[in-house]
């Protein structure tokens, strides 16, 4: 019997004492199915130090009692060089590590490879299957297979299929509402207040009944079982599952939400797995956005272009719930959050599916895995296809090297600035100079025809493509083909949406490889590779800068793979020269009407052509400043970039100072927030937020790692740290407004205004009387 299945997820289990791979998916007729393959093989490779045939016999003889069942001698490659290897088959995946340890005592091999490849990954490689893709399977019914929520078959054979269509997936978005009176809610003490779900049609909410959250949890679990979603999506749901699991223990509920009736469990990359379903935590995707500072759901939604109303902050939850007339607003917000999470998923789902198909990672892993792990997943597939052995992870010493070129900006404001983007430079350089661990020629080894890096003189072979460059060649060729296909389809079509998501995923993966090369945790880490790519990158940027200046263009800033250029008329000529003479792609990424640079690198603010502000590195985008300081800086920046009216900006700052000194600014805007990276008592340096956390702990608040602590600075003559008090324990009249003016508002405003020659005294209406001039009349 043949079936066609779209592979949703996979995991491994023991069936009748044997390793088996469980393939969960959606059939072409819309059924949810499980296919079980228990004819899987576990193996790893040895590089023998003596005759390979002798090693194979000795390993089989000595290893039988530990689980070795067969050995073969085969030809493979290590860093592009042919080697004879011994392939060691082991009865169970759980025994591989033990077998390697025991065999080490034989002292007949130099190194092991692929001993830490997960069985599910191995299976996909061996069968040529890819998550989020279609395959055909020859199956049979078997009454000995486990009885679970979906129909189950035993696999006899599989074959990948070339089909782009995505089945209609059942998706449920979930939002958990939790709070407590003192500090962050803890599952040991604090019940869940509400769970809101949205499946694209139906909105549901289950609430705490005032006595226990047992019924709330039972209703939620039953809904998951009844709706049987393929995808569960949340924001911060990794932590929510952990919280929910602890609550289930407290109220005696079985959290059986997997398709095999199993509980959620921690998997790779810090990901929580719900067996048979895709569990998506959008917070992981949000954390990849360098422009976000607070990582709240509404901030994240706005960053991807969604319109969102301001939300009640978490620190206000308990206050709202304690007031019957306000509580309903919070419950309504939870419902809206579930709908917002669903909306975000509809925006990102195509991208997630395409990235899954390209990397070979299940959909719920592509967001939790780091960019390096995603690149490595693709590299593993590429290495397998060319017979290259996959190195095992191991401890490697980190040796620093010089990174990308960052120019010192000239302080000032500039108009009509174009940003020339070289984001595809590093992939193209790695291709051009064949930069890869397996093409690197070690010092002392002969090479008659090599590429030589500009500074360190590292050498790379020209005679064959490396694993990195083979990967890049395929990625860039695929992206060109996809972009060409985009031209022939309508922009409002599903096909366009899918193709666009794919070309973005291909671009991100290609651009990731340069960073991966310098990641010490990489399986194929080689410092010389990363160092050489950086050298050729700096060399390329310097040549572009030199040419631009020869053409009479002004370069005001440069950062790794971008140049900020004035004189747009000559820009197209420069781009043509870069493409023809340097062989690199360059394009105008954005244009600023005006842009302001401070003297520091990586700190600027600009007014884009569409009228929006972009801020990099300034206080307004950093989390350790009070809201009043951030608001002031952002508005001063806006005034100056839009109007260049110094008097208007100074008047605005004076008004803020006056309102602050009069006490009319809300207390919430005075709070300075810091996240705890360790328990309060573990800090050796007692910074203000640590002292505030310790004070809260004394008063019964539960402060843990990851919690945000908010404090305000109060009046007094002692050190600032000693006057930093938890905002919850302070009355507004006790706030030291002079501190906020002198150490928050003025420094934040001056970061912008000093560029225009404004000094601090200019901000004071009556300098001789000092700050008291701004007090109450």
Predicted regions, residues:
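Conserved DEDDh/DEDDy metal-dependent 3′-5′ exonuclease domain
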Residues: 49-53, 58, 62-97, 205-293, ...
């Amino acid at each position: 019997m043949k079936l066609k299945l779209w592979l949703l997820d996979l995991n491994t289990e023991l069936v009748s004492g044997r390793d088996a791979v469980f393939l969960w998916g959606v059939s072409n007729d819309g059924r949810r199915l499980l296919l079980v393959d228990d004819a899987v093989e576990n193996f790893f490779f040895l590089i023998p130090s003596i005759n390979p045939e002798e090693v194979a016999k000795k390993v089989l003889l000595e290893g039988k009692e530990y689980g070795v069942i067969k050995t073969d001698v085969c030809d493979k490659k290590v860093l592009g060089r042919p080697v004879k290897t011994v392939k060691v088959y082991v009865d169970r995946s759980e025994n591989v590590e033990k077998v390697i340890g025991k065999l080490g005592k034989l002292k007949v091999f130099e190194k092991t490879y692929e001993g830490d490849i997960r069985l599910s990954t191995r299976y996909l490689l061996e069968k040529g299957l890819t998550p989020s893709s279609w395959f055909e399977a020859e199956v049979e019914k078997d009454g000995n297979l486990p009885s679970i929520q979906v129909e189950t078959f035993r696999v006899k054979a599989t074959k990948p299929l070339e089909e782009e269509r995505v089945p209609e997936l059942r998706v449920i978005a979930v939002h958990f509402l939790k709070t407590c009176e003192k500090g962050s809610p803890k599952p040991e003490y604090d019940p869940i207040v509400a769970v809101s779900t949205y499946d694209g049609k139906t909105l549901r909410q289950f609430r705490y009944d005032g006595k226990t959250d047992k019924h709330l949890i039972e209703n939620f679990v039953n809904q998951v079982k009844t709706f049987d979603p393929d995808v569960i999506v949340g924001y911060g749901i990794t932590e929510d599952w952990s919280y929910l699991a602890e609550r289930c223990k407290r109220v005696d509920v079985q959290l059986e939400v997997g398709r095999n009736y199993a509980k959620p469990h921690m998997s790779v990359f810090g990901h929580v797995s719900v067996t048979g379903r895709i569990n998506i935590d959008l917070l992981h995707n949000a954390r990849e956005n360098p422009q976000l500072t607070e990582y709240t759901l509404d901030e994240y939604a706005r960053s991807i272009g969604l319109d969102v109303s301001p939300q009640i902050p978490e620190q206000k939850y308990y206050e709202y719930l304690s007031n019957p007339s306000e509580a309903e607003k919070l419950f309504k917000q939870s419902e809206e959050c579930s709908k917002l999470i669903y909306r975000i998923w509809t925006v990102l789902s195509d991208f997630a599916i395409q990235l899954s198909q390209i990397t070979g990672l299940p959909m719920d892993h592509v967001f939790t895995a780091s960019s390096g792990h995603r690149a490595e997943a693709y590299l593993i597939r590429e290495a397998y296809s060319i017979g290259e052995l996959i190195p095992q992870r191991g401890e490697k010493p980190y040796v620093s090297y010089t990174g990308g070129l960052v120019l010192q900006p000239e302080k000032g404001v500039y108009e009509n600035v174009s940003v020339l983007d070289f984001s595809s430079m590093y992939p193209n350089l790695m291709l051009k100079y064949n930069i890869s661990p397996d093409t690197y020629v070690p010092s002392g080894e002969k090479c008659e025809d090599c590429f030589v890096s500009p500074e360190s003189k590292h050498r790379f072979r020209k005679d064959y493509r490396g694993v990195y460059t083979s990967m890049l060649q395929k990625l860039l060729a695929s992206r060109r083909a996809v972009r060409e296909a985009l031209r022939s389809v309508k922009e409002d079509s599903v096909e366009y949406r899918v193709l666009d998501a794919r070309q973005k995923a291909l671009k991100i993966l290609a651009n990731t490889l340069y960073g991966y090369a310098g990641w010490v945790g990489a399986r194929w880490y080689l410092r010389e590779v990363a160092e050489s790519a950086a050298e050729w990158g700096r060399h390329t940027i310097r040549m572009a800068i030199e040419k631009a200046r020869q053409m009479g263009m002004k370069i005001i800033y440069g950062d790794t793979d971008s140049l900020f250029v004035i004189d747009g008329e000559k820009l197209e000529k420069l781009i043509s020269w870069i493409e023809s003479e340097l062989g690199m792609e360059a394009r105008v990424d954005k244009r600023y009407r005006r842009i302001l640079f401070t003297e520091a690198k990586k700190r600027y603010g600009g007014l884009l052509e569409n009228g929006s502000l972009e801020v990099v590195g300034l206080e307004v985008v950093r989390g350790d400043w009070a809201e009043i300081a951030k608001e002031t800086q952002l508005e001063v920046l806006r005034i100056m970039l839009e109007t260049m009216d110094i008097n208007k900006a100074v008047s605005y700052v004076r008004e803020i100072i006056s309102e602050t000194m009069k006490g009319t600014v809300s207390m919430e805007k005075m709070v300075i927030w810091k996240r705890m990276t360790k328990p309060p008592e573990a800090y050796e340096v007692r910074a203000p937020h640590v002292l505030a956390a310790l004070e809260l702990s004394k008063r019964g608040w539960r402060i843990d790692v990851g919690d945000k602590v908010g404090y305000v600075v109060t009046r007094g003559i002692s050190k600032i740290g000693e006057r930093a008090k938890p905002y919850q324990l302070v009355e507004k009249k006790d706030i030291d407004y002079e501190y906020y003016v002198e150490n928050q508002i003025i420094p934040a405003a001056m970061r912008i205004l000093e560029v225009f020659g404004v000094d601090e005294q200019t901000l004071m209406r009556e300098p001789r009387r000092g700050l008291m001039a701004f007090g109450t009349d």
